[in-house]
């Protein structure tokens, strides 16, 4: 299994986690207290499930191909963002991160 520590090498990354299909935390690295990591894993799993459903609906209504299965999602706040690909989620500081580098690192880990 690929190491989540690779994500912490991306400038601006503050923490990352991997979750199981039921939403339980598999592992976490960085500045994420265990109780926050547990909640974040549940949130990431729930959001991923919702995005899969949204992608299915969008593909069905639009007739466009290539939307399913959805692979990931992102949510941006004022200072921090959350990026998810597969069952890996990374938390970053917006003012420091290169989103291109983050996506490359997430892709390497998620597609191994």
What is each model feature region?
Residues 1-112:
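Non-catalytic interaction/Regulatory regions outside core domains
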């Amino acid at each position: 299994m690929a190491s989540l520590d690779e994500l912490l090498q991306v400038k601006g990354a503050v923490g990352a986690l991997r979750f199981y299909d039921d939403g339980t935390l598999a592992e976490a690295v960085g500045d994420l207290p265990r109780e926050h990591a547990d909640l974040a894993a549940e949130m990431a799993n729930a959001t991923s499930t919702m995005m899969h459903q949204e992608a299915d609906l969008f593909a069905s209504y639009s007739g466009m191909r290539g939307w399913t299965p959805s692979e990931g999602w992102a949510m941006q706040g004022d200072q921090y963002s959350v990026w998810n690909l597969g069952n890996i989620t990374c938390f970053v500081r917006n003012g420091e991160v290169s989103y291109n580098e983050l996506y490359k690192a997430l892709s390497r880990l998620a597609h191994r």
